Amino acid sequence: MAPSHWRVILNGKSTDNMDLREAVGTLRKRGIQLDVRVTWEDGDAERYVGEAVADGVHTVVAAGGDGTLSEVAAALAHHEGDAASLPSLGLVPLGTANDFATAANLPIAPLEALTLIAERVAQPVDLLRIDADHGPHWCANVASGGFGTQVTVETDEGLKKMLGGLAYLITGMSRLGRIDPISARFSGPEFSWEGEFIALGLGNGRQAGGGQALCPEALIDDGLLDVTIVPDLDGEVAATLGTLVIGGKQAALERVAVRARVPWLEIVSQQPLTLNLDGEPETSRHFRIECVPARLRMHLPGECPLLGG
């Protein structure tokens, strides 16, 4: 039997990670044919995934944060064919927030993460397909809008490197009193809501932006999109809620949130609305978000909270 062939797609910011380097060497000694490619600019992940598919690679491993995972997952989803015909997907979490990995209970240590990929059979997982003004996009974890999106977009890269997830909280605190509500209309099967909101979560996964659990019960294998809308509130209440949302305080969110679970959702806004798609901002007045069931196969822990079984 031929050895398993993996392709690791490594975020260029993590090339000095010695733990990953040693883990790759260990997996090679165990008989896995493992190649590494490093991303430096836009389009690299797409190209490397295309090469992996053409080379008949069995597993593509995203080594980086939520953005790297999303890039690699999107690149796989762009290819024709079902999940069984594409390489399986693995994740070595090397980002600042690692929101998907945290919610999925994936190990952070590179050797443990790679060992899990080797030992666990890949499971079918959903992806979100987002159609907007500038063409279709794919999202592996959470699309968010409003207050949390501005915090993620505005958080300084240097601050993230020094302080990790705490950087998002500091940025959120600095925005208190500047929460501008957004007006939009939401519609999906047996769901409709229209009004002004300050935060929005559209979840395949559960959390984004450094620990904001906007969709705390979302599953990545149920074929459904979890929707959380936080309506506009009076100034002081909104500021307090903003702090609690950034800090992951679910009780405050549950008191005011509008929730739904649908296979697809349309959003129409009179003003440009920015959604953060796993770290990548996309602005449009009209979005259609669809949960595409079992689009990929992914290696996940046996007791993964994101799987419904």
Curated annotation (Swiss-Prot):
Binding residues annotated for Mg(2+), in chain numbering: L219, D222, L224
Keywords recorded for this protein, A-Z: ATP-binding, Cytoplasm, Kinase, Lipid biosynthesis, Lipid metabolism, Magnesium, Metal-binding, Nucleotide-binding, Phospholipid biosynthesis, Phospholipid metabolism, Transferase
One example of a Gene Ontology biological process annotation: phospholipid biosynthetic process
Keyword check for Chaperone: no
One term under GO cellular component: plasma membrane
Signal peptide from the UniProt entry: none
Cofactors that this protein relies on: Mg(2+); Ca(2+)
Record carries keyword rRNA-binding: no
EC number: 2.7.1.-
Cofactor note: Binds 1 Mg(2+) ion per subunit. Ca(2+) may be able to substitute.
PROSITE patterns xref list: DAGK
Catalytic residue list: E280 (proton acceptor)
Domain DAGKc: 1-134
Similarity annotation: Belongs to the diacylglycerol/lipid kinase family. YegS lipid kinase subfamily.
NCBIfam families: lip_kinase_YegS (TIGR03702), PRK13054.1 (NF009602), YegS/Rv2252/BmrU family lipid kinase (TIGR00147)
Function: Probably phosphorylates lipids; the in vivo substrate is unknown.
The protein, known as: Probable lipid kinase YegS-like
Organism expressing this protein natively: Xanthomonas euvesicatoria pv. vesicatoria (strain 85-10)
